Each structure stands twice: as C-alpha cells, then as structure tokens.
Amino acid sequence: MELETSVYRPNVAVYDSPDGVEVRGRYDQVFAKILTRDALGFVAELQREFRGHVRYAMECRREVKRRYNSGAVPGFDPSTKFIRDGEWVCASVPPAVADRRVEITGPVERKMIINALNSGAKVFMADFEDALSPSWENLMRGQVNLKDAVDGSITFNDKARNKVYKLNDQVAKLFVRPRGWHLPEAHILIDGEPATGCLVDFGLYFFHNYAKFRQTQGSGFGPFFYLPKMEHSREAKIWNSVFERAEKMAGIERGSIRATVLIETLPAVFQMNEILYELRDHSVGLNCGRWDYIFSYVKTFQAHPDRLLPDRVLVGMGQHFMRSYSDLLIRTCHKRGVHAMGGMAAQIPIRDDPKANEMALDLVKKDKLREVRAGHDGTWAAHPGLIPICMDAFSHMGNNPNQIKSMKRDDASAITEEDLLQIPRGVRTLEGLRLNTRVGIQYLAAWLTGSGSVPLYNLMEDAATAEISRVQNWQWIRYGVELDGDGLGVRVSKELFGRVVEEEMERIEKEVGKDKFKRGMYKEACKMFTKQCTAAELDDFLTLAVYDHIVAHYPINASRL
C-alpha cells in the first residue's frame, strides 16, 4: 500500500473519540484509520488505569534526584538482595527471536522501515523515541507505516530516484520502541490532561497489529518491544501490568508480549535483576544503551564536582565504569536466561574518503569483536552498510543463535558498586567543548524541523548525543573546569562558552551553506541550547524542555462527519 496524503480542511472533520478523549492534532483521513474510537478507547483505558502509578514513579525519580544532589550516590538496594541472590529465570525466549545477532535501528519513517526490514539484520527496532522528533505528523505517520509493514503492504515511491521500495520475502523481526515514561503526548488529552506518550505509542500499535504480527512475525508470540529510559524496577512493574492488561484485552496468552529493556540510566544498572524479575514473563533481555548511559552519569552526578567527565569522545567502553556496566549486564542476563544485547555502532560509511572509511569500519569491527568475546548475544547498527561487519563479528558464536547457555558464566557479584561508579579518566579540551556545542546545536535544529535521526560528522546521531553534549557543557561551565590541550590553564566560563558559541555558529553556517542555514532553525536552536547549557539548574531532558516548540494544536470546535 502506498501512503496516502490528504489536505486538512479546518472546521470540517474531527476524530471519532470516546468520552473524555480529545484529539488536538491535525485531522487526516489516513490518521483516522489509526485513531479509531475503539483504539482511542483502549489508550484511554491504559491511561486511566496506570496514570497514578506513572505519577508516583516520576515523583520517586524527583526524590532520588534530590538525594543525589545532596551528596548520595546510587547503589544496590539491600531490600531486594533476595531477588539478586535468587535462582529464578525468565520465561524461555520465543524461537522467533532466539537469533538477534545484529539489530538495525531507526525512526518509524516509511522508506527507513522498508530498508531496515530488508537490510539482512535479524531485528529492526522501529523507534518512536530518541531517533524521532515527536511531532504529530511523525507519530501518526509512523503508526500508519508500521501497520502497513506488519500486514506486508508497505511500499514507498521515491519519485526523485524513480524507484519503488517494497518488502523482500525475508525480513527482519520487528521490535518497536515507544517513548519513555516521562514524555507526554500533548496532542491527545484524556480527561483534560495530556496522555502519557509511551501509552499512546504502545496502545495504538498494539491495538491495530497484535493479531497480524503474531501470525506473520511472532510464531504465536508478540508483538515485541524495546523499553527505554527506566530508572527503577517499579517502572518495569508498570510496563508488566500494561502488557498483562493488553493481553487480557486481546484475549491472548499471558507472556505473549515480549520486551527488551535498555539499561541506559545509571540508577538502572543497580536494578537489572529487579527489572528482569518484574518482567520475567515478558522479558527477552537487556541492552547496553551506552550513549544515554553516559548522559545519565553526568545528570546523576550534576552536584558532584569531583565526578567531572573528560571529553565525551574519550568515554568509551574502555573506561572501567563502562566495561563494568557491560560485564554486569551480560552476567545478569545469562543467569536469568535472556539476551544481553550490545551497544550502538553509529558510524556511517564515508563514501568520498576510502581511507577514512576503512579506519571507521575497522573501529566498528574491533568494537563488535569485543562485544561478542565479552559475551553479548547481539549488537546494534545504525546503518545497513555496517550489518555485514557486525554479522561477521558475531559469527564467532558458531552455529549458536546466542550465547545465553554457551558462554562461561561469571559471578555477577564480583562487580562492585565501586566498579560501576569509578570516575572516568581523560583530558578536557577546548575542542571537546566546541564539538559538544557544534553537534548539540545542529542536532536540535534538525529535531525542531522534524528530524530525530541526524547524520553529523560521519555518525548517525540521535537525541542521546545532544543530551550528552548539553549536560557536559553545563557541568564544565558550572564548575569552571580547567582545560587541557590547546586551552591549557583556561577555565570554562559563561564568557568563554559565549565566544565558542559565536565561532561554532559561524563554522556551522560555512559547513551547511548560507541558504540552508538561513532556511533552517539554527539560530532558534542556538538560543535554546545556550540557555540549557548556562541555566542555573539542569533540566532533566532536553527533548522535554523544548517539546512545546513542536506541538501544534488544531481547532476542536469542528462538526463531526
């Protein structure tokens, strides 16, 4: 099916919504096939049943943040030691997703979905979260695209290339990542309040696709999900209850829905057993969301001047705290019988520089070999061109689809709180400050104009990179970091940062060209990014702080067709 488009006619039509549900996004006949009365009713049921639990979980986050800002540090919870020490295991991994050696990720855009499903990867994670700017158009077209993908009818006509894209006979297994618990959906009001973004993403997708998915992709299981940004097992418990509620609505067996949780916040690394325990009937593992993990490290220790990060390009898996996090995730997952997924390879093939391309691909190869030797069962890639390299690295597992049972099982308790909290080593340079600023502004400019997955300097960047750039700049300014390298002896200040911003804006204009710079939202992004970096208090999420800039409410006093 080719995606239709329709013209919005103000005050002509509204969505057929149940009582208490108000859709404030643009009306579109295609979107109306997703936003049906029954589908909106299901989302409303989820919202009403779980909003109190979500509010409590978010208040707990704020309370923990206050403790960290008063000098406390994260650690293992003594009250749940019995879970960590217990011999329980999660439900068996469904055969349909036993082999996850290489997973490709990307936004829920139509061409992207087709190319990713055809890429040769074992799994495609379709993203409503960090790789998508959550505008109404992007979210609803994403739901339409996924519905077409699940029923096998999706096509895309690229008129510029005179090419029609469609699915191959063999495609990757589809996982969907909804937004995190903290993000609202301002275009859908339920009982007068914005809906919880992830319940909208999950609810609409599940409602329309569970039956077809289980038949064509899941071999009786599914749908499959990735769950982001959790900080505590209580948040996993909410997801488990949401899954059970959805299974009951659909009349399918408990444990049909399966999910992998991204461990991408510092507090969550101390909760991995507890998270798996809460989701033990619905889990298919954990994933090292390493870029957001670095962001979370800075955010968690925002009031700890003794824990300043070096240049972000130096905070890789060679750092002790990062290696410890990865090793603990592997040991935890394998003890509980589920996948331990590796992190993202964000490199993009460099077509105009063969030597640089070879060096970049060699780095990917080394990183993926490190992952498979450490015990990971699979890994992530951002570009189809990386899949052969990643697949070759994970061929070291032999004929086994994973290493859950074949890998030597080390004792997870050997990894201590001190290992997970060790301060990373490295220099802090003026170029590090410049790169953060240049990348942060360009990413935000793209996000504000509808793109959440952005190629920058031969890497495919998503919101995690902008978040790291923002919080590290904030941290360095806040504590007047003394720079190494060319800036030796100079301390970071608002004045220095102001000069860096001016110079980097000039560089961005030269790199993208005057016309694109003028047409884009670079100046607006610069103001927002600068404000975030110099604020007295650090906002929890950049994407939440600037979300209102992409919300577009439409009239609701329209007549119903």
Curated annotation (Swiss-Prot):
<dbReference type="InterPro" id="IPR001465">
    <property type="entry name" value="Malate_synthase_TIM"/>
</dbReference>
<dbReference type="GO" id="GO:0006099">
    <property type="term" value="P:tricarboxylic acid cycle"/>
</dbReference>
<feature type="active site" description="Proton donor">
    <location>
        <position position="462"/>
    </location>
</feature>
<dbReference type="InterPro" id="IPR011076">
    <property type="entry name" value="Malate_synth_sf"/>
</dbReference>
<dbReference type="InterPro" id="IPR044856">
    <property type="entry name" value="Malate_synth_C_sf"/>
</dbReference>
<feature type="short sequence motif" description="Microbody targeting signal">
    <location>
        <begin position="559"/>
        <end position="561"/>
    </location>
</feature>
<protein>
    <recommendedName>
        <fullName>Malate synthase, glyoxysomal</fullName>
        <ecNumber>2.3.3.9</ecNumber>
    </recommendedName>
</protein>
<dbReference type="Pfam" id="PF01274">
    <property type="entry name" value="MS_TIM-barrel"/>
</dbReference>
<keyword id="KW-0808">Transferase</keyword>
<dbReference type="InterPro" id="IPR006252">
    <property type="entry name" value="Malate_synthA"/>
</dbReference>
<keyword id="KW-0816">Tricarboxylic acid cycle</keyword>
<feature type="active site" description="Proton acceptor">
    <location>
        <position position="177"/>
    </location>
</feature>
<dbReference type="Pfam" id="PF20659">
    <property type="entry name" value="MS_C"/>
</dbReference>
<dbReference type="InterPro" id="IPR048355">
    <property type="entry name" value="MS_C"/>
</dbReference>
<comment type="similarity">
    <text>Belongs to the malate synthase family.</text>
</comment>
<dbReference type="Pfam" id="PF20656">
    <property type="entry name" value="MS_N"/>
</dbReference>
<dbReference type="InterPro" id="IPR019830">
    <property type="entry name" value="Malate_synthase_CS"/>
</dbReference>
<dbReference type="GO" id="GO:0004474">
    <property type="term" value="F:malate synthase activity"/>
</dbReference>
<dbReference type="GO" id="GO:0009514">
    <property type="term" value="C:glyoxysome"/>
</dbReference>
<keyword id="KW-0576">Peroxisome</keyword>
<dbReference type="InterPro" id="IPR046363">
    <property type="entry name" value="MS_N_TIM-barrel_dom"/>
</dbReference>
<keyword id="KW-0329">Glyoxylate bypass</keyword>
<comment type="pathway">
    <text>Carbohydrate metabolism; glyoxylate cycle; (S)-malate from isocitrate: step 2/2.</text>
</comment>
<dbReference type="GO" id="GO:0006097">
    <property type="term" value="P:glyoxylate cycle"/>
</dbReference>
<keyword id="KW-0330">Glyoxysome</keyword>
<dbReference type="InterPro" id="IPR048356">
    <property type="entry name" value="MS_N"/>
</dbReference>
